[in-house]
A protein has these predicted regions:
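Acidic, proline/glycine-rich low-complexity IDRs
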Residues: 109-151
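Short, surface-exposed linear segments at secondary-structure transitions and domain or protein termini
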Residues: 53-58, 66-70, 128-133
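Amphipathic protein-protein interaction modules
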Residues: 75-127
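Intrinsic-disorder-associated interaction segments
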Residues: 1-9, 73, 77, 84, ...
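Generic detector of well-ordered alpha-helical segments enriched in charged/polar residues
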Residues: 5, 9-20, 81, 85, ...
Length: 151
């Protein structure tokens, strides 16, 4: 039992770690969205930097005077997304190996200052059952929700 929990936690920590690397450890909070439904895996990530909620491609918008800019190249963004997606695949394999249900949706929040980590999971199909919305739409909605409630 402990081994499953440890490996699951390590994979989530890796998702947060690569997102922190993307902003050179200069963020207040990190948010990771991962979706794994049927044979499709997708992800998204965003930040709270200088009290501004920003998507990964807009992190430079949160900089204050004198702050060094971030490398937000498409290549770096895809590198992070690929690692998050690979970790989600590993979680899927882990869940199968231990005969556990695989979350269809994972919302991870890491507060850098306090070290607090919060995870929210869904196990029912989310975007697969929606005729219009994709996993990206649900990730965008979560970003807007986080901004609205100041989480």
């Amino acid at each position: 039992m402990k081994q499953f929990e440890d490996r699951f936690s390590e994979l989530q920590a890796d998702m947060i770690s690569i997102c922190m690397e993307y902003v050179e450890d200069r963020a207040g909070k990190v948010y990771v969205y991962a979706s794994c439904e049927e044979d499709m895996i997708s992800s998204s990530f965003f930040y709270l930097i200088n009290n501004k909620y920003v998507e990964c491609h807009k992190v430079n918008d949160a900089l204050e005077n004198g702050d060094e800019g971030y490398d937000v190249s498409t290549e770096r963004q895809f590198m992070v997304l690929n690692i998050i997606n690979d970790d989600a695949k590993k979680i899927k394999v882990l869940c199968k190996e231990y005969e556990r249900d695989m979350p269809t949706e994972m919302k991870l929040i890491y507060d850098v200052k306090s070290g607090n980590f919060k995870a929210e999971y869904k196990y029912d199909l989310v975007h697969t059952n929606d005729d219009i919305k994709t996993s990206d739409d649900f990730a965008d909605e979560w970003f807007e929700e986080i901004k609205k409630i100041n989480l």
